[in-house]
A protein has these predicted regions:
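DUTPase catalytic domain/fold
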Residues: 1-150
């Protein structure tokens, strides 16, 4: 089978959780985005930021990226701490964390919030992109989360 884009569980030694991992799924046959699930139960005080590791990595083509947003059903209580998550294709299987996707969530509700294990917390959609003629680099990614230019 020719792989184009999709999701896999990260290798065991790079996992951050111990429970069962649910790969992202589309809510319907025509949905644009894929739901990401919480691997653990979480509590967060008002204005607290939590990092939810998914233990999932995404593979895609050279001219694609995966963009993450908080699910609309969580929008009144949570936001992504960096407002949007951008996953480059070279994040997949990087040597630092095997491409483990982490989601920073900030509690914006003004009261303590709870996330259940298995709850859908974010959505990711694959996008094609263009590169500028004079903006390319030969730098190869070696790090994981937040490692570009480090």
């Amino acid at each position: 089978m020719n792989r184009v884009r999709g999701f896999e569980v990260v290798v065991d030694e790079k996992r951050k959780t111990t429970g069962e991992i649910t790969l992202p799924t589309a809510g319907t046959s025509r949905a644009m985005a894929y739901d990401f699930y919480s691997t653990d139960e979480w509590h967060a005080a008002p204005d607290a930021v939590i990092k939810v590791w998914t233990d999932v990595k995404a593979y895609m083509q050279d001219d694609e990226c995966l963009i993450l947003n908080v699910r609309s059903s969580m929008g009144g209580k949570w936001m992504l701490a960096n407002t949007q998550g951008w996953i480059d294709m070279d994040y997949y299987s990087n040597e630092s964390n095997d491409g483990n996707i982490g989601i920073f969530l900030k509690n914006i509700s003004g009261q303590t919030q709870h996330i259940e294990k298995g709850e859908r917390i974010a959505q990711g959609a694959f996008f094609k992109f263009l590169r500028a003629d004079n903006g390319n680099t030969d730098v190869i990614r070696t790090g994981g989360f937040g490692s570009t230019n480090k």
